[in-house]
Regions:
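Covalent nucleotidyltransferase
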Residues: 1-103
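Nucleic-acid 5′ end/cap handling module spanning
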Residues: 1-14, 61, 77-80, 99-245
Length: 245
């Protein structure tokens, strides 16, 4: 979530209505208008699905009970009038300005590392605390604006996310070819969990494999799927097809 001058905006550029996250807006009301905070809404132990259920952008939505439990975890900031400030400078500003604030504001811990072993130890430490992973940044780099992130995934070359992935096998119950909005060919493979819930995966096959499976659909076979976590219903999220067995 981006925050500036009392406004909260999602990464897909939707503004949250003013009745959402009032506890966060009030906690940050003293900040100058020329800084944009970058972070995420989080409650340790809650699933992403549960957190998202509190984050409606509908103009007339009613905040859910317990919405005040959402914590704004801040990990970066941007100064439009000073766009070249380094990550080290921005981190210093965050620490000196925000670190003393109580909930619902939380400054994400940032550590300077000088050797791979230090990074490995910190990654292990935070995984043991049940966090998904860590983010590595170049301390001298400016904030990665959209103009700086020129590749199709909109990735900033000075930031690297590290997470653990899991894999499991699921029965395939349907397969079909798809066409994207730019007429590119794709596929949708529908799988079933042991509890009977279905989900779809649409990445991980070459174009040759896509066409081959039209002639000989893999229904009834097993798909090995790589995923980050399970939803509250036990369905894999952020998934990629590794293989059809």
């Amino acid at each position: 979530m981006l925050f500036q001058a009392g406004h909260c905006q999602s990464r897909d550029e939707h503004l949250w209505p003013k009745q959402q996250f009032t506890h966060i807006r009030e906690a940050l009301a003293h900040l100058p208008d020329d800084v944009i905070l970058d972070g995420e809404l989080y409650v340790h132990g809650w699933s992403l699905q549960k957190i998202n259920s509190f984050c409606s952008v509908h103009p007339n939505c009613t905040p859910k009970p317990n919405a005040h439990e959402l914590i704004y975890n801040i990990f970066d900031c941007f100064f439009p009038l000073h766009p070249l400030r380094s990550f080290a400078e921005r981190t210093h500003w965050i620490q000196s300005t925000l670190a003393h604030l109580p909930a619902p504001i939380s400054v994400v811990p940032t550590h300077r590392v000088t050797a791979p072993l230090e990074a490995e130890e910190l990654y292990t430490h935070y995984r043991q605390l049940s966090y998904e992973g860590t983010m590595y940044r170049d301390s001298e780099s400016p904030y990665g604006t959209q103009l700086s992130c020129g590749n199709k995934e909109n990735r900033w070359t000075c930031l690297l996310k590290r997470k653990d992935w899991q894999d499991a096998e699921f029965e395939i119950v349907d397969y079909e070819l798809t066409t994207g909005k730019h007429n590119e060919q794709g596929f949708k493979l529908t799988c079933k969990t042991e509890s009977g819930r279905t989900f779809s995966v649409g990445s991980g096959l070459s174009h040759v494999e896509m066409r081959d499976y039209v002639l000989a659909p893999p229904i009834g076979r097993l798909a090995r799927v790589r995923y980050l976590a399970l939803s509250d219903q036990g369905v894999p999220t952020q998934l990629t097809l590794e293989a059809i067995l």
